Amino acid sequence: SRGWTYRKDIAEKYNINMDNIKTFDELLPVLKMIKENEPNMQYPIDWGSDRTPEALMKYEEIAGTAVIFYDTDKYDGKVVNLVETPEYLEACKWANKLYNEGLVKKDIMTATDFEQRLKDGKTFCYVDFLKPGKAKETSAKFDFELDQSTVSDIWQDNGAGTGSMLAVSRTSKNPERVLRFLELLNTDATLSNLINYGIEGKHYTKIDDNTITIPDDTSYTLQGYQWMQGNVFLNYLTEGESPDKVEALKAFNAEAKKPIDYGFKFDNTAVEAEI
């Protein structure tokens, strides 16, 4: 699903209920108020390369700007050119409004320091791809707590389904052993936690049997990327995460709708130059 990730402390300070904000137009007065009252928050809303305003639109990329909208009642499951849709035009107009009113960084489309701006306290919120506990996971990178609010329905798109897949290289000299390792990574909790969090006492400390705390100066570089490795249902919870996270994730996945193109992967070999 998609929605807002935002600074929990700022929302509480100004009594902002992000659950009541479902559109960019509803968000705009909040951004202006924060810009006026929080001098350090130069960019009340921000985004990285995959979290631009059109991320709230209900579509899935097929190839380049060729997309299929989830709203099949309106688009009938046809492939359309994203940049020719009225929804895309509205997203561009809204981004332009933010730019003209000084609510986003002037070089937002080329800037690469999105996380650093958030870490420096210059940003209140951004569009994000959400799941239960996502904000808590992301908060581990910062000195403040993030919260989240869902805007869209839950969709099981192809990108989410293949984004963390692991495969055996066709050039592997020992494919059977690689496959055995991948099987263990997805079934053995000890191995999964070793790969994802490192060594107990060195890279993390146990609080209880299934919860750990990670020091700020950890040298283990997978912090924040555990969702990519193995089976997330086997992993420890980190301090502050809900003990119900695993069950919430399973319920979240079960509720997800599948778009009309689910399981389809476009082979662009014949039109690679055109795309």
Spans of features found by a protein language model:
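Extracytoplasmic/secretory soluble proteins
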Residues: 1-275
